[in-house]
Curated annotation (Swiss-Prot):
NCBIfam families: rpsE_bact (TIGR01021). The N-terminal domain interacts with the head of the 30S subunit; the C-terminal domain interacts with the body and contacts protein S4. The interaction surface between S4 and S5 is involved in control of translational fidelity. It holds the Pfam family Ribosomal_S5_C. This is Small ribosomal subunit protein uS5. One of its GO terms (molecular function) is structural constituent of ribosome. The keyword rRNA-binding applies. The keyword Transport does not apply. It comes from Dehalococcoides mccartyi (strain CBDB1). GO terms for cellular component: cytosolic small ribosomal subunit. One of its GO terms (biological process) is translation. Residues 15-78 form the S5 DRBM domain. PROSITE patterns: S5_DSRBD. Part of the 30S ribosomal subunit. Contacts proteins S4 and S8.
Length: 172
């Protein structure tokens, strides 16, 4: 599942919303069919902050505004290494699996659909991606966000491992 992160105040950031998809849904009731809409929105400031939100309503504009408000409530801070991700990672959400690989400067975002929208909102400029498993846009977007939040600083990991090895060697 997605990792727990600290709360980020959206009022301090200049956020831009991107609509990933709108889905028309129908509920069959005794009197006929009731139409509704579901929207998936990604919001980010292009400087390491990104969030995903889903909104449902009877009309499209209200579904989009609900999704945008939900995305602002679910903001995450992402660790970057310059314009790319610090290391390769494969993250799974439901049946959707997303591979994120660092790329050389000037490569661009090699991604499609909801993966591209999430990465552009984050501010990542160079990355290689592969989406595997299901093609459900919501699950692919959540897998991408999960992979980004699971990123760790390689230098911090090395120092943490070294300190734990020293403690083990000294018998502490």
């Amino acid at each position: 599942m997605l990792a727990k992160v600290e709360r980020i105040d959206p009022s301090e950031l200049e956020l831009n919303d991107k609509l990933i998809f709108i889905n028309r849904v129908t509920k069959v009731v005794k009197g006929g069919k009731r139409m509704g809409f579901a929207a998936l929105v990604v919001t980010g400031d292009g400087k390491n902050h990104v969030g995903i939100g889903v909104g449902k309503a009877k009309e499209v504009p209200s579904a989009i505004s609900k999704a945008s408000a939900n995305a602002k409530r679910n903001l995450s801070r992402i660790l970057l290494n310059g314009t790319t991700v610090p290391h390769e990672i494969v993250f799974k959400y439901g049946a959707a699996q997303v591979l994120l690989k660092p790329a050389a400067p000037g490569t661009g975002i090699i991604a499609g659909g909801s993966v591209r929208a999430v990465l552009e909102s984050t501010g990542i400029k160079d990355v290689l991606t592969k989406s595997m498993g299901c093609s459900n846009k919501a699950n692919v977007a959540k897998a991408t966000l999960g992979g980004l939040t699971a990123m760790r600083d390689p230098k911090a990991t090395v120092t943490k491992r070294r300190s734990s090895l020293k403690e083990e060697a000294t018998g502490g």
